[in-house]
Amino acid sequence: MKKQYLYIVIVWALLAGCGSQRIFFQQQPKVNMRSNLLSESEAPIGSAKREYRHSNSNWGVEYSGEQWVRNMSKPIRITEGLANRHLSVTPSHGRYYDRGKDRWKWQRPELFCTTEDLFTQTIVISYLIPMLENAGATVFTSRERDWQRNEVVIDNDDRTKQPQYTETNGHRTWHDAGTTGFASRRREYTNGENPFLEGTVRVARTSNRKNQSLITYKPNIPKEGRYAVYVSYATLPNSIDDAEYIVYHKGRKTVFHVNQKMGGGTWVYLGTFGFEQGCSQRNCVVVTNVSDKNGVVTSDAIRFGGGMGNIQRAGMTSGLPRCLEGSRYNAQWSGAPTSVYNAKEGQDDYTDDINTRSRMTNWLAGGSCYVPGLSGLKVPIELSLAVHSDAGYHNDYSSVFGTLTICTTEYHDGVLNSGISRNHSKNFATSLLHDSQRDLSNKFGSWTARKVYDRNYSESRLPEVPSAILETLSHQSFPDMKYGQDPNFKFVFARSIYKTILRFVANMHNTSYVVQPLAPTNFNIRFIDKNKVRLSWNPVNDPQESSAKPTSYMLYTSLSGGDFDNGQPVRGNSCQMELQPEILYNFRVTAVNKGGESFPTEQLSAVCHEGATRTIMIVNGFHRLSSPAIHETASEQGFDMNADPGVTYGPTAGWCGAQTAFDKSNIGVISSSGLGFSGNELQGKFIAGNDFNYTTTHAEAIMSAGKYNVASCSSTAVENGVVNLDNYYCVDLLLGLEKDDGYSFVPYKTFSKNMQRLLTEYTRSGGRLLVSGSYIASDMTSESERNFLNNVLKVDYNGETPSRNYTNITGMGTSFDIYRTINEDHYATTSPDVLHPVGSAFCALLYGDGRGASIAYDGRDYKSFVMGFPFECIKSHSKRNAVMRGILSFLMKN
């Protein structure tokens, strides 16, 4: 009877929740831990001069050296955030090789268009890590973080890369460092092969700028896009803490200092940058030996892009981008010893992957002041967080299952490697649970907080620093996933996690903290002279955080297709700038305080055309972020991606495929008929979302006309009275996928009552109006809204959408294709509106089935051109420009 009871308890524990750590391990032998009470002569292993005793700190010791990686080009000084803090944050699971079934598979089922292996990335990679980095932290994640399938590695050992790898010697020469390093000897690696033990490393003594020595790594980028940059080097006894790396990205220059006293022999993340296709000096990384420190700089391989999985199991790789694989395989590619990722000797990748996440953290942190009793790379990682989703549901089909956190205090006599109590982990887990409940309830109504588990789970037991597992919500519960798939919910949840980490770290070190601000609003650019513009914006108050007030701002600029610079500080909420003629300027703004930096505003653009007498104002009205369409009846529930795939914040790696099973009665059934079951047609694809940069596409097209100045603004600036449309001869209102879908947590009405009034007044005064968007007519359903469509936009709508088989549009003496299906390059207009002319208006463009795509009105009172699809969804750059020139020729004529 006792055995039966024990069996039931264990099975229940294994089945509850996500089960990522639901493997119970035999308790390891207890060991004596190093005390954090150090004598004058005693110091942690590897401490050198980087640590000092701190009696007011919960740690009892502080790291006081240079941060692992510092962006020296960014003019922001963070004093009450997470600067010089090193954190480990990893999304759960990932693709793994199942030896018993001899195939690669997800660790969790495909439900509600995703799987936990994909879903938690969309919180951690898109929101949480950027927030932590904006607060100044260096963040390690054991899974590949770059959503980029391409990868280029340049290494000194591969002479075929010449001239992509070049050395320039000054007073000090580059030579072999006499230690092992990275070499790419093969396309794929079998179990146990370590690329960081197969090559060599270059080294040079430090010098001044005048006598510098350089190594240039110039990749041949296969496709223009954003690529993570990783560097590698060796840590030697006389390594310096400010090795200089210069990243040239689309001609822009960003300088980093890397502390080479730690982290040698693995990939070290610098940042993610825009690179142009091909091989040029505009896109490269330069390592110098410049430093005022007396020592050496080492340099090994440099990697551009996350790449495809290259770890072979039973003769096959996963066939997916590395970022979708489990930590086990990334650890091998990153040079970790087999003890980190291969304890089961290739017999059980599932268990090895679970343990790899924590062992990677310990390997990096070993020898630092926070993990002094282990050998490792001496990176002072001080906190570990595993972000998961759980399993479970309520039979009423409507109640949220909610959030759970996990810690482990009863292990190794209740202390961590440095000697501090494991109760700090419990404090962290408790704060995560209650803080998230408070923040989510304040924003979305009552949120369910389940409990704090103090149990034996791998990712809360193995880390030798304070740690917790956060089970965000249940991926098996549709009421939970209605929240979870909404990008606005993800932002709020991630911000709550970031704030908890901020407060916890500050408490551990007995320091003050300030919460980073929210992004500014009402961003706008207006001409105040023939070649001078004023940029202005307003702060956004965070009612939940009194400290989250901006004290200054950062203005980021890019020129004519180049990458953005590292920002210029602005004290107030406006600035002036002189524009050079015929150059496309793009701008973003962030809010800044002592705690860090906000997310950016939308991207706005400006062009000064020499001799221009008229200015066109581009109004960005596309701010929508949403889950896929929600389908919910008495008997069915789920996401209907065919009706509307939703809009993510930038690209996403979170979709596995469309949901195919909606029957509520099959809740909890693990089969193709089970509620939420989804396909796999989208796995491995990075689906484009809202990049918030479409004013640039419109400005480029207007610029091709060679006649007009271009200004731009957010639609909020128009609706709040900051920008007066009557000041502009022509207005280009882009609405993209904007619509009030009825299920998103933020309403995104195409034409609010206020905007209807403003556009009515603008046209009555003789304005010239261009409007484009997928739902400009279908989103207007009331009688008054239909009257606005008829009387102002001169269009009518009968509920029609062209077949998705039709991607071609004709008219205006040309034809072109638009994005109709979701893809990796640009968001898609899956359901554009079919428009009908009213009165004297006429069809200017037709869909492939002959129905109206655009309606033009050439009145004596005003002129308008209304498109039932987003202008920026025209695929061809040259066609976009030609169509815009034709539209402007029509609108701007007297």
Describe each model-derived feature in a short phrase.
Residues 281-284, 301-309, 368, 383-384, ...:
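Active-site-adjacent mobile loop/cap segments within catalytic or ligand-binding domains
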